[in-house]
């Protein structure tokens, strides 16, 4: 990469000159289903900016800079790069993010979207719009990111499917129609029509990233090119000529400049969606305008560990200008930090720059405590609200136990794991204080494979990884009676019942429409109007567990000293939600209600060691008397298969408790949408391939939590408890509280 860096340095002054003018900046990134050709497309763009030699582009996978990505030919992390490109006689700076397409890595996509204003959605011409395409487009539209379309692998339509020029045209129209249907479904109302793809306006390109050519309909019309000419180019062997006349990088970068808005335009509609502050304030106005002279506000989108420089935070400057030596305040962490260095990215290389103004993507050294999703501001404005929290679509549902072969290396391993979780918040780390057991949870088996590979690379230590275990959730199916929890010293008594939390409230928590730090009256109004809550109950919410979707409500009145122990009760609530009484799995969808309390007057007798166990024990007794059950994670499968094999594929799914939700058929392909428990998904790949003689594509992603089948529940909970070294028998309420 050293030659690449030299080329960049030559342009650094020019890049900084453009960076000051938001109209000449574009923030975009690739979004796609796995293997549809995003990274190969990105490499072609690097070639255009002189960062890769033409011979190498398309094979180099330069943006796949973690070695495992090159081995597996798949992007795992989101990589950033700033490109210099001249268009219509004007220089532009295009900040480009390459994101992973594999479903296990949607967390990286979510974080990248925060810094983009537009997304180049890459779709394989043969496979068309797939589940992951739908997921990333939906996420992009939720973040008000405008999509444009690149239909890749046109060569496959010609060489593999041997389609005629008319059939190719039909295939492209079908993909555009499917893509526009997603925009119709998920786009904000004011952009449903504006953001639909119109091929005639050049909002779609088609081509082959591998063969480095790409063309839009207006370009084709201008040059007098028809689909038959493209078919000829492949059949008569002059594809290189296509790549010379219509280089992919020029087509894509021109499309980005024309159809993706500059930051000062995009922020006018994105800021009201991403930031809940006062838009008429000094900060609000600067954010809407992407004003480089306004107060500094930066949204952090990812954090990476650098072996030499420590933690590097990457984010977008939404207003102001960040300079080396500036102090920033990390909202939410209540910390002031000094920026030691500012950089821009060129793939894996970071180039030091003296400053970066609003509208650009920047990397910062010195803000070690910042995390993905954090907001950094000028300390004079430390009171402003932060950017909205990021929503991760998938949840960690698969767990492995990690054990060092040499116990002396435990601390080193734990440190490295903590760094991994900082870099990738969709990983979940639990360390059992008593046994020292390390449990790492991820979104899928591949996610964990890559995390453990990175761990080995970084620590150079030997450790064992257990076979993957599935994470479950515990919940209740009815309202319990009231149970009394006594503190160990018998001086405090707390009375609780639990009941199921309704789906609407869970959705309001998931979409962050209601949050713990919201003004209580505003929150109560939303709960009353949208979820039918009673006013007093809605106002009595003490805490919202937005990780597992549970709430605790205070329904008492006039109890002495209750305010003094409120925090301890909330801590006891959170403690009990992390591992329920059935099988020590997290609780989900539970409303915990405090109805009465007797609190000792002396603070020495009502500390956390008294109140937390009393809370937890009463909640556990209540859960066990409210028809508790397990929820298991289901995956959604989207399958494309030759019609002759539908029967065989269906019987494989049935055997694994799968359920077909939808089926459509075209002449050479059938499309099935199904749900399948994660528990049943481990060896299904081989079975599906065998059933369809290899003629099958499919993709999986997390769908939802569903109740475990009643007929299998008792035995399964016992097995689960045994695996965890617990007593096999399911506990009774009286194991936690005294009954008179």
Curated annotation (Swiss-Prot):
One of its GO terms (cellular component) is cytosol. Pfam families: EFG_C (PF00679), EFG_III (PF14492), EFG_IV (PF03764), GTP_EFTU (PF00009), GTP_EFTU_D2 (PF03144). One of its GO terms (biological process) is translational elongation. It is found in: Cytoplasm. Disulfide bonds: none annotated. InterPro entries: EFG_II, EFG_III/V, EFG_V-like, EFTu-like_2, P-loop_NTPase, Ribosomal_Su5_D2-typ_SF, Ribsml_uS5_D2-typ_fold_subgr, Small_GTP-bd. SUPFAM superfamilies: EF-G C-terminal domain-like, P-loop containing nucleoside triphosphate hydrolases, Ribosomal protein S5 domain 2-like, Translation proteins. GTP binds at residues 32-39, 98-102, 152-155. Catalyzes the GTP-dependent ribosomal translocation step during translation elongation. During this step, the ribosome changes from the pre-translocational (PRE) to the post-translocational (POST) state as the newly formed A-site-bound peptidyl-tRNA and P-site-bound deacylated tRNA move to the P and E sites, respectively. Catalyzes the coordinated movement of the two tRNA molecules, the mRNA and conformational changes in the ribosome. Belongs to the TRAFAC class translation factor GTPase superfamily. Classic translation factor GTPase family. EF-G/EF-2 subfamily. This is Elongation factor 2. The gene is fusA.
